[in-house]
């Protein structure tokens, strides 16, 4: 399926747009998850049973009743079972529309964002706003696990290729549980081709996955065009197909753009983690 021949034509992403300073929920634009899941064969039933698109919104401001500007940071969780994901530029424009709008308090802003995102996503959305003083305890974290990035390998082909994972467990004779991490994940925006930089954590139980093959596979996303959420679901499906682990979690955290970072989490056995902040976020 060519995504750009369908509903993505109407997205504001990659187009010149006006910045609206007064609240307007219609600025939010959905992207059907089925556009990517159809190609993966997982539209009706996903191989993961837990998941969310975890967003951090750093640029939220509104006016209080007296007209004094207020600021906050938001944690947002959009359930993986929602019909749509939220297009990121539209989310940015939507948040900007709060700038010159009066709200009674932070709770009203939080409730408004939660309701609007739920309608756009057609699914469950959780929103938690934090004052800057309450956010001051947040520290730079790191993904737990063994980092693959120091492997001494040579790469000359950067085209996406899931078949790199073929026979990735052929040398394994026992079931292991391990957590693997790479900070070399890079893909490109589906619409604008702008680079998206991320770190990925893979926690699995099953036959041991060849570390070199896995790193080569992750690097092959380097010139691949897909949204963050779609990349994580593709990684999950490819590992399931070629490694067949009993348990699997794929969690990626991408760098911030437009005051937003997007951090998709998919698992068949672990709960959604508390939002954190990596070094590049």
UniProtKB/Swiss-Prot annotation:
Keywords: Cytoplasm, NADP, Oxidoreductase, Queuosine biosynthesis. InterPro entries: GTP-CH-I_C/QueF, NADPH_dep_7-cyano-7-deazaG_red, QueF, QueF_N, QueF_type2. It is found in: Cytoplasm. One of its GO terms (molecular function) is preQ1 synthase activity. This is NADPH-dependent 7-cyano-7-deazaguanine reductase. It comes from the Bacteria. Pfam families: QueF, QueF_N.
